[in-house]
A protein has these predicted regions:
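Aromatic sugar-binding surface patches on proteins
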Residues: 87-94, 574-606
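Binuclear metal-dependent phosphoesterase catalytic core
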Residues: 441-548, 553-556, 602-608, 615-631
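Extended active-site neighborhood of metal-dependent phosphoesterases/phosphodiesterases
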Residues: 191, 198-208, 279-376, 380-382, ...
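Short, ordered, surface-exposed loop/turn motifs in non-cytosolic proteins
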Residues: 66-69, 137-140, 145-159
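Bacterial Sec-dependent N-terminal signal peptides
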Residues: 13-46, 122-134
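N-terminal active-site segment of His-dependent metallophosphoesterases
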Residues: 131-138, 145-146, 189-281, 645
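Short, acidic Ser/Thr/Gly-rich low-complexity loop/linker segments typical of extracellular
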Residues: 156-174
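A short, solvent-exposed beta-strand micro-motif common in secreted/extracellular proteins
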Residues: 177-193
Length: 645
C-alpha cells in the first residue's frame, strides 16, 4: 500500500440557536400546525467528514428531534435527507448522506410533512483513501502528516493499546465499552485543534459488531522546549459574578502567552471546570464551558482532566456520568507526548451516586483497574528516559505525605523508573510533596483559579484567595527537554508575590470587628472558627504564608541585622477567615463546610521579633533560585483594606 494519503481536517464550532415555535420553518413558509416543533439546538457551524460518518449535535431542555424525525439539508435547488440514528436526553446523531457535497447547507428537522429550519452548516466532504479492513478488527484508521502516514503512534480504546504501522495504519479489536478511540499524540507533532480544543479522540457507536474508522491528521512542530500552563479548579457556573472574575484570569494568562511566544505553549486543566449542581439550574454545563473557552482563549491547545463536578450527577453510578464529557471534551483518561515529556491524564473520581442529585452525589478517589491496566500498556511504549507527568483531580498524597488515593501504591509502582510529576487540584489549596528520593514522584497540589468557589472575590474583588490563604492563580511550567521548572502565577499579581505577612500583635479577630451583622449563632460559629486569632497578643509574632512552599525553599528573616528562625506552624489563614467566613456570617448565610478555613495550612511560618515596632527584612527563595522579598514595617494593621494594596 502506498504511504502517501490526503485527508482533510475536522473542525467543529458551535453556536447556540433558540428557535421559537411560531416562526416560519422553511423558505416556503410552512408553519408548525397542530403538532408544535420547538427546538433549542447547539448547531455545528462546520462539519468535515465522509459519506456515512455520524455527526453528533447537542440540544437543551429536551427541545430536540423525536423518533421518526430526520435531518433535511438543502443547498440551492439540491435537497437530501439524512437519517437520525440516535437520540439521547440531550444529543442526537445523524448520518451524512452520500448526496451531500462540499458547501453550505440549510439545516432543518423534518417531522412528517412539517419542516423546521434551524440554521446553516458548512460541510466539507472528504475523499478518503480506502483502507482494507482486517478480519476480527472492528476499529481502524489512518494517522498522517502532510499526506504521509506516521508510524509508531499509540492508539487505544481505553482497554486495548496498539500502534500505527509503517504506513500510519492501525487496527484494534475493541469491545467498544468506552465508546471511543483516541491516539497518544506523538512527540514533535500536534493534532488538529478546534480553536483551543485538541481533537485526538473519536466517539464510537458502541456496537462492536460493526466496523468503524477514525482518522487523524497531524502537523509537525518543534515542541521539545515548551510551556505548559496547569489550571486548577474553575467552577464556572454562572453565579457569584464568576464570569467577570474569570475574565481577570483570562487577561492574566494572555499576558503569559505573549511573554512566552517564542515557545510552543499548551494548557492542561486539573478538573472541575464546571459545577454539576448548576448544569441544569443555571444552564451551564461542559458544552457551554467549551464554547466559552473557544471564544475567549485562543493561541494554545488546552488539554483537560475531569473533576468530580464535571460528572453528570443526575445519572446513576459512574459510566453514564461522563457521557457528555467524552462527547464534547476528551476521554476521561488518555495520554499525549510533547517534546521529551509523556503526559498522562487520569480520572480518579469513581462515582457511586444514586442519580438523584443532592445527597445522592457520592464518589470516592480511586483509579479503576481498567485505568491501571491501560496505563501499564501505555507506559510500555514510553522510554524511561522521558519525564512523566500525570494529572488527576483528587490528590495522590495529602499534605502530610501519606496516600490520599486509595491505590496510590499501585500507581507509584507503575511509575517506577521514571522522573515523575503528579499534578492535582480538588481541595483548593497548594501543597507540594517531594517524594522523589523514595519513589521518584514530585506531587503538586495546585490551588484553584476560582479559590473559594469565587466567593472571596465576590465579596472583596481585590482579594480572591483560597482557604489556605493562597491567592487565585495557576502554574507556569517550563519544559526544556526532560528538565522541569515551575512557578505559581497569582492572578493579577507578579510572580514575586510569593508570600503574605501578618503582624499578630495587630490581630483581634472577633465578630464585632469583622461580622457585626451576624446572628447570635453566626457570632458563636465564627468566633469558634477564628479562636486562634481572637485574643489580643503582645508576643511580637509575625506569620508568613509562603504559598508554593516545599522543603527545598529557603526562608530568611532578619531584625536589625539579626537572623530570626522561622518555624512551621499549624494554623488557619487569618485573611481567608475575614474574607470568606466573616462575610458569609455577616450576610446572614452559613459558610460551606468545605470552605471554612482549614485547621492545617501546610505553609505558614512564624518568627518572634524582639520589638513590636521593628522592621523585618524577609527573603524567600524557591528551589530554582527565584527570590521574593519584603521589608515589613511594623506595626502592620490587619484589615481587608491593608491587604487590598
Amino acid at each position: 500500500m502506498k504511504n502517501t494519503f490526503k485527508i482533510l481536517s475536522l473542525l467543529l464550532s458551535f453556536a447556540l440557536l433558540a428557535i421559537a415555535c411560531t416562526e416560519k420553518i422553511d423558505d416556503g413558509g410552512v408553519t408548525d400546525g397542530g403538532d408544535q416543533m420547538s427546538f433549542l439546538i447547539s448547531l455545528p457551524e462546520a462539519v468535515s467528514g465522509a459519506a456515512g460518518d455520524i455527526v453528533s449535535v447537542k440540544f437543551y431542555s429536551g427541545k430536540g428531534p423525536k423518533e421518526g424525525d430526520s435531518v433535511v439539508l438543502k443547498k440551492g435547488s439540491s435537497e437530501c435527507e439524512c437519517e437520525i440514528v440516535a437520540i439521547t436526553a440531550n444529543n442526537f446523531s445523524f448520518r451524512i448522506s452520500p448526496q451531500v457535497s462540499t458547501g453550505k447547507y440549510t439545516f432543518s428537522i423534518k417531522r412528517g410533512a412539517q419542516i423546521k429550519t434551524i440554521g446553516e452548516v458548512n460541510f466539507t466532504i472528504e475523499k478518503r483513501v480506502e483502507i482494507v479492513e482486517k478480519e476480527g478488527y472492528n476499529v481502524y484508521g489512518l494517522i498522517s502528516c502532510d499526506g504521509v502516514g506516521v508510524p509508531g503512534v499509540v492508539v487505544s480504546d481505553g482497554v486495548e493499546v496498539t500502534t500505527t504501522d509503517k504506513d500510519g495504519l492501525y487496527y484494534l479489536k475493541s469491545d467498544e465499552y468506552n465508546r471511543l478511540v483516541f491516539m497518544s499524540v506523538p512527540s514533535g507533532y500536534e493534532t488538529i485543534t478546534d480553536t483551543c480544543i485538541p481533537k485526538f479522540h473519536k466517539v464510537l457507536d458502541g456496537n462492536s459488531k460493526t466496523t468503524e474508522r477514525a482518522d487523524w491528521q497531524l502537523t509537525k512542530v518543534d515542541n521539545k522546549d515548551h510551556v505548559m500552563y496547569l489550571l486548577g479548579d474553575m467552577h464556572l457556573a454562572n453565579r457569584t459574578n464568576d464570569a467577570s472574575q474569570f475574565a481577570t484570569f483570562l487577561a492574566d494568562i494572555k499576558e503569559q502567552i505573549k511573554a512566552n511566544k517564542s515557545k510552543r505553549q499548551y494548557a492542561l486543566t486539573l478538573g472541575d471546570m464546571t459545577w454539576d449542581l448548576y448544569w441544569y439550574d443555571n444552564v451551564y454545563d461542559l458544552s457551554v464551558y467549551v464554547d466559552m473557552m473557544k471564544k475567549k482563549l485562543t493561541g494554545l491547545q488546552i488539554f483537560h482532566t475531569i473533576g468530580n463536578h464535571d460528572h453528570d450527577m443526575k445519572e446513576v453510578g459512574d459510566f453514564n456520568t461522563v457521557t457528555l464529557y467524552k462527547k464534547v471534551v476528551a476521554p476521561t483518561y488518555s495520554s499525549f507526548n510533547i517534546g521529551d515529556v509523556h503526559y498522562v491524564v487520569l480520572d480518579d473520581i469513581l462515582c457511586e451516586n444514586t442519580g438523584t442529585g443532592g445527597s445522592g452525589r457520592k464518589y470516592k478517589s480511586t483509579l479503576t483497574t481498567d485505568q491501571l491496566s491501560w496505563l501499564k500498556k501505555d507506559l510500555s511504549y514510553v522510554d524511561k528516559s522521558k519525564t512523566l507527568v500525570i494529572t488527576m483531580h483528587a490528590q495522590m498524597y495529602n499534605e502530610g505525605g501519606s496516600a490520599s488515593l486509595s491505590n496510590a501504591s499501585e500507581l507509584a509502582s507503575l511509575c517506577s523508573g521514571y522522573k515523575t510529576h503528579v499534578m492535582s487540584a480538588h481541595t483548593h489549596v497548594i501543597c507540594n510533596n517531594d517524594l522523589s528520593a523514595s519513589n521518584g514522584i514530585m506531587h503538586h497540589n495546585s490551588g484553584a483559579i476560582c479559590c473559594t468557589w469565587w466567593w472571596t472575590g465576590y465579596y472583596v474583588p481585590e482579594l480572591n484567595i483560597c482557604k489556605d490563604g493562597s491567592p487565585a492563580g495557576y502554574y507556569v511550567y517550563q519544559m526544556n527537554g526532560t528538565d522541569v521548572k515551575w512557578r505559581f502565577k497569582p492572578t493579577g499579581r507578579d510572580f514575586n508575590y510569593a508570600f503574605r505577612t501578618y503582624d499578630r500583635n495587630k490581630i483581634v479577630m472577633t465578630a464585632a470587628n469583622f461580622a457585626p451583622n451576624a446572628s447570635s449563632t453566626g457570632v458563636t460559629n465564627f468566633e469558634k472558627s477564628a479562636s486562634s486569632w481572637s485574643a489580643s497578643s503582645k508576643d511580637n509574632y509575625v506569620y508568613i504564608n509562603v504559598f508554593d512552599y516545599d522543603k527545598s525553599w529557603k526562608i530568611e528573616v532578619t531584625e536589625n541585622g539579626k537572623s530570626l528562625t522561622p518555624e512551621l506552624v499549624s494554623i488557619k489563614d487569618p485573611l481567608h477567615l475575614v474574607t470568606y467566613e466573616a462575610k458569609r456570617y455577616n450576610a446572614g448565610s452559613t459558610p460551606t463546610s468545605d470552605f471554612k478555613a482549614r485547621t492545617v495550612t501546610s505553609h505558614i511560618f512564624r518568627v518572634k521579633a524582639s520589638s513590636a515596632s521593628s522592621t523585618l527584612e524577609i527573603s524567600v527563595t524557591d528551589r530554582f533560585g527565584n527570590v521574593s522579598t519584603e521589608s515589613m514595617k511594623r506595626p502592620r494593621e490587619f484589615s481587608i483594606n491593608e491587604y487590598k494594596k
